[in-house]
């Protein structure tokens, strides 16, 4: 069986591009700072780097990456302060404000809440110029 080097190079380039896009999210500054509060519905702790869905608008769930301050994980009933970096903040501009409580979800199941204490990305700030 002969393998086309051109086809293999194209596949490799596509995979590298996908990895680059995923790593760009990890290398961006966080979008918001929050207080995480988990409600006990998870069986296991949420580890730093956890990527659940967040209900940022009444009709919009988006994935975000959690980073926790001073702890590696938060127990199922625990709280901690940290940040969320959203995957596509340009899709839901001007929808957040300090004090807003957004649900943290695994599918339709709410596993906790994040109360916004700071907004770093002006595009997301409801009162910002974005």
Walk through the language-model features, giving the residues of each.
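C-terminal effector/interaction modules appended to NTPase cores
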Residues: 4-130
